[in-house]
Every structure is written in structure tokens, then in C-alpha cells.
A protein has these predicted regions:
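Beta1-alpha1 glycine-rich phosphate/pyrophosphate-binding loop at the start
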Residues: 10-89, 132-133
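FAD-binding core/adjacent interface of flavoenzyme oxidoreductases
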Residues: 1-20, 88-141
Length: 141
């Protein structure tokens, strides 16, 4: 499925949104979902892009590993989180390049234009140059 992407258009945008500014939000984690919800009542078209079709609530992952919480309780579909918004389109895939001077991103090999870009791709763990620590200290955000 490399290179494939799926359009989960929640509802067709209203006519007034067809020419509204286009906001692209890359990342469906805490920051991306918050940005999306903050723009709910704005006259903008929002495209939310993530590699996964769900938001993972990482603070409860340890409870999944101990059996106190089921996997489904920590992974909420993006559609469920932003599905009530009429100005959102969710795309699944990966942004591989950003061209701020041309206001373009490359998503699954194709260029897309935007008016505003929100990069909310999250963070990763660092081992301060000691990758051998990764074996003994698996990251859990």
C-alpha cells in the first residue's frame, strides 16, 4: 500500500468554504487535534493529515500493557474526534516535504497547496547519542 492514501471526507464543505483559506494540519496527536478543534467555527478549509487513522492517547499505554485498559480505550479514530466539524477533511499518509516559500507540501508523492500550515508531528525520545540504551530503556512518552 505504499503511496496509497485514503480520503475520509467527513462531509462536503459548504459553498462558502470552497474558496476559504486552506489550513493543512500535519499530525493527528494532541496538538493537531487541538488546532483542528480550535478552528471549528472559522471560515477555513482544514485538511488533517496523519499516518494513522487514530489518535493514540499515550499517557495510558502503560495501563494497556498491564491489562487494566483495553487497546480500544487509548486509540480513538480521527473521524470520531473531528467528525462533527463540517470544514475538515482527513487524509491518511505521510508528508515528505514542505516548501514554505511556495506554500506547498508533498503528500504521498503529490504536491498540495496551503494557505496556512500547522506542523504538529509530535516528538520522539532521545538517548543523547547513546543508541545502545534503546535496548534497555524502551521509550514510553
Amino acid at each position: 500500500m505504499a503511496g496509497d492514501h485514503y480520503f475520509l471526507e467527513l462531509e462536503p464543505p459548504e459553498e462558502r468554504l470552497r474558496t476559504a483559506p486552506h489550513v493543512v494540519i500535519v499530525g493527528g496527536g494532541f496538538a493537531g487535534i487541538h488546532a483542528c478543534k480550535a478552528l471549528k467555527d472559522s471560515d477555513v478549509r482544514i485538511t488533517l493529515i496523519d499516518k494513522r487513522n487514530f489518535n493514540l492517547f499515550q499517557p495510558l499505554l502503560y495501563q494497556v500493557s498491564t491489562g487494566l485498559v483495553s487497546r480500544g480505550d487509548v486509540a480513538t479514530p480521527l473521524r470520531e474526534l473531528v467528525g462533527v466539524q463540517r470544514n475538515v477533511q482527513v487524509l491518511l499518509g505521510e508528508v515528505t516535504q514542505v516548501y514554505p516559500e511556495g506554500k506547498q507540501i508533498v503528500f504521498n508523492g503529490k504536491a498540495y497547496n496551503y494557505d496556512y500550515l500547522v506542523l504538529a508531528t509530535g516528538s520522539g525520545s532521545t538517548f543523547f547519542g547513546h543508541d545502545e540504551w534503546r535496548t534497555f530503556a524502551p521509550p514510553m512518552k
